[in-house]
Amino acid sequence: MSDQNLDIQQDHQKYVESLGDWARTNTCGELNANAIGSEVCLMGWVQFRRDHGGLIFIDLRDRSGLTQVVFSPDVSVDAHERAHVLRSEYVLAVRGTVRPRPEGMVNPNMKTGEVEVYVSEWKLLNTSKTPPFQVEDRVEASENLRLEYRYLDLRRPRLARNFQLRHRATQAIRNYLDQLNFLEVETPYLTKSTPEGARDFLVPSRMNQGEFYALPQSPQIFKQLLMVAGMDRYYQIVRCFRDEDLRADRQPEFTQVDIEMSFVDEERVQSMAEGLMARVFKETLGIDVALPFPRMPYDQAIAEYGLDKPDTRFDLRLKDVTDILRGSGFRLFAKAELVKAMRVPGGAVLSRKEIDDFTEFVKVYGAQGLAWIKIKEDEWQSPIAKFLSDDERAALTTELGLETGDIVFFQAASPDVVNNSLGYLRLKVADRFGLIPENSYNFLWVTDFPLFEYSPEDKRYVACHHPFTAPQVGHEELMVSDPAKARARAYDLVLNGNEVGGGSIRIHSREAQEHMFRALGFDPQEAEEQFGFLMQALELGAPPHGGIAFGMDRLVMLLAGSASIRDVIAFPKTQKATCLMTHAPDQVAAKQLRELGIRLREKQEA
């Protein structure tokens, strides 16, 4: 901010008045032709000021929108003369009369574009320094600068709309669950640290020095205990905390809609969840979603889409061609554990640079490279075409339905690398060719998840979801004898390739829970120390129960059509889990540490 601008702002402070007995009659986004002739009082921020033909025009903004207000000497000489001091982001209250805009001046892009308010008197409620960026949707400032001045960023109309939408979604959720006799119950934020998840955020106890609380990664155990307590139907819109490395769509603290029900099976939980999504979409976007949602087994999702959260808005599929290429002259194909192909109709138009970019993209997912073949009218164009026999070409043509003008991408490696790299490449290719229809919402239940997954880091099987998920009937013995084949009574709700919810039917007996802990390699004493209170509850008449949790932030992001989850969180953290506005996390005073019985080691000692 220049010294001149600072001097102007400080000089204008002398014009600031108190609100007094003025009361707002309308918001800045609601006036229309029906209000013509009305006397109104509006309050908000100066968006723009324009001097034109002896008149001063101000776009006055609040969270509801903009109204054009006019300072005319024909209405009030005093109000007009004083209006010359107004600058962007000054806080203003105006009284005046609603008039129709002159012919040819109607703005159809504004809710209030038919009218304007001629000001008879006004008050300057506060001044503003020159803001570090213009408060408008077409902002050019960096995201870091906008996060530093987040309260300014939140004045932008698009973000204001996001939080109005979030509020409507929250209200729709509460109203729907209330009608189904759910109870909203709060669970503790200060709780016990337990294994089998991401890292916990730990909170030292002053009264019990040397001991720590953990902030909850989810209210999972507490909501199960509420079912044991006979609450029957519980929900909570709750903050959760995970100390994990952050991706672009993750935050260390996030909001989930947490739901649990007694005396239910998978179908009943899913039916409730479908009705909830239908209510939210109807009340926020006015969209009727088709019910029931389709189901897809986990194995099919991985086989055909490469991911357990397939985007079904477009129809590119992966095909297993391992057997076709087992004897291939191309050594990588012949020796690979898994070879998959993805045909892209019309994809032969891709340039070599675009293919090279795709090759670099799949390396992020562990791939060593990306094989490809362009199907031309007279030849197969590819560095690997010479290694393929006529029989292999014929088999690939039949299996993949190849036609002239197509391109085929191949991946040959371990199943994890093949599925992840081609699964995410599928999304990239769909974006490149415009295959994803706009304003479409495809829900999908993914079911029959593995109960366990092998962790190379821990060199053991860990729970795919959490250790309280019930195995499918008849899979109890597989938990120990062949854990890779054990399937869970778990289900995820996917929307346009995004996981928006996940749940399961829970274990509800001590014997079955102990069996799960044994399968996970828990020492009995360790299990008792960590989860003894839960297992004790399971001995005291626990009903069959299950539930689901929705990621509120991601759901609202999709409703808003936003590219970033940070656009629907009021005060988000960066990918380094820092707050650029408050500078959290921060050092604390030595006195506070002494009261907690904590002493920091020097960095070189650590």
Swiss-Prot record:
Its EC number is 6.1.1.23. ATP binds at R242, D243, E244, Q251, E499, G551, M552, D553, R554. It is found in: Cytoplasm. L-aspartate binds at E196, R242, H465, R506. Keywords: Aminoacyl-tRNA synthetase, ATP-binding, Cytoplasm, Ligase, Nucleotide-binding, Protein biosynthesis. It catalyses: tRNA(Asx) + L-aspartate + ATP = L-aspartyl-tRNA(Asx) + AMP + diphosphate. One of its GO terms (biological process) is aspartyl-tRNA aminoacylation. CDD domains: AspRS_core, EcAspRS_like_N. It comes from the Bacteria. InterPro entries: Aa-tRNA-synt_II, aa-tRNA-synth_II, aa-tRNA-synth_II/BPL/LPL, Asp-tRNA-ligase_1, Asp-tRNA-ligase_1_N, Asp/Asn-tRNA-synth_IIb, AspRS_core, GAD-like_sf. It holds the Pfam family GAD. One of its GO terms (molecular function) is ATP binding. GO terms for cellular component: cytoplasm. Its main location: cytoplasm. Residues 220-223 are annotated as: Aspartate. The record marks H52, G104 as: Important for tRNA non-discrimination. Belongs to the class-II aminoacyl-tRNA synthetase family. Type 1 subfamily. Aspartyl-tRNA synthetase with relaxed tRNA specificity since it is able to aspartylate not only its cognate tRNA(Asp) but also tRNA(Asn). Reaction proceeds in two steps: L-aspartate is first activated by ATP to form Asp-AMP and then transferred to the acceptor end of tRNA(Asp/Asn). Homodimer. This is Aspartate--tRNA(Asp/Asn) ligase. It comes from Oleidesulfovibrio alaskensis (strain ATCC BAA-1058 / DSM 17464 / G20) (Desulfovibrio alaskensis).
